[in-house]
Swiss-Prot record:
GO terms for molecular function: rRNA binding; structural constituent of ribosome. This is Large ribosomal subunit protein bL21. One of its GO terms (biological process) is translation. Keywords: Ribonucleoprotein, Ribosomal protein, RNA-binding, rRNA-binding.
């Protein structure tokens, strides 16, 4: 059984027990978050596709941890003008585990 969900403006294909990193959620570690933006659910070989979402379907995610991703460097410069700007960024994420898919 799998589902396609949306959280943080991105879509994920999830199964029960999967661990994934999503955009930061406002929840504490140990909390259970309910996602109702479910676009498709497959159960026993039968695929239900929503228009745009599947009615009554939801996915329960358990928050395990919060963190920051790998640092990326933004470097801007203009040749011959002595203009240089260096900036770093680390994207915040939430690590979640899929507890249940309810369809």
């Amino acid at each position: 059984m799998f589902a396609i969900i949306e959280t943080g403006g991105k879509q994920y294909k999830v199964q029960q027990g999967d661990v994934l990193k999503v955009e930061k959620l406002e929840a504490n570690p140990g909390d259970v978050v309910e996602i109702d933006r479910v676009f498709a659910v497959s159960k026993d070989g039968e695929l239900k596709v929503g228009a745009p979402t599947v009615e009554g379907a939801k996915v329960l995610l358990k928050v395990e941890d919060h963190g920051k991703g790998k640092k990326i460097i933004i470097f801007k410069y203009k040749p011959k003008k002595n203009y240089r700007r260096k900036q770093g960024h680390r994207q915040a994420f939430t690590q979640v585990r899929v507890e249940a898919i309810q369809a």
